[in-house]
Amino acid sequence: MRLLIIADEDPRTRDHVMKVFGDKDYQIVAPDSVDLVLKDVLRKEAPVVLLGNVFDNMPAGDLIPILKKCNKNLTIILVSNEESLPLLRKLRREGIFYHALKPAREEDRDELLQAVRCAFANITGLSGPVGAAAKGHS
């Protein structure tokens, strides 16, 4: 089972994303505070985080560098309808793996699923269990 953190302040988006991944061989963790996300990231238990624009009153642009300092191998997928190119460029420099739109339509859900599959494939090198590969990146 692949562990996936959903860190989004909007409960509707969080619930919707949980439904998208709930039956797809993923163990979903949806903490309600930054400190709980940091705890999981520091323990290197979850190799992929789906991060909204704002989480626990903290903008993604402030949170991403902290998450990457806690675990440089963490894969962050920004799930946002943000359209500001300068901001998206900044977040890419900070280390996001991918920017996906909030899954409002079927195409958005498919895109998000594909981005997460790709993230886990990169972590595992297309072979072996995710947990072992993630622990090997410590």
Locate predicted features.
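Alpha4 helix (beta4-alpha4-beta5 surface) of REC/receiver domains from two-component response regulators
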Residues: D62, E82-L101
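Conserved phosphotransfer microenvironments
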Residues: P47-C70, E82-S84
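Two-component signal transduction core modules
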Residues: V49, I76, H99-A100
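Two-component/phosphorelay signaling modules centered on CheY-like receiver
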Residues: D10-V29
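Acidic, metal-coordinating helix/loop segments flanking the phosphotransfer/catalytic sites
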Residues: A30-V48, G52-F55
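Conserved phosphotransfer cores of two-component systems
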Residues: L42-K44, L67-N73, E94
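CheY-like receiver
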Residues: D108-E111, F120-S138
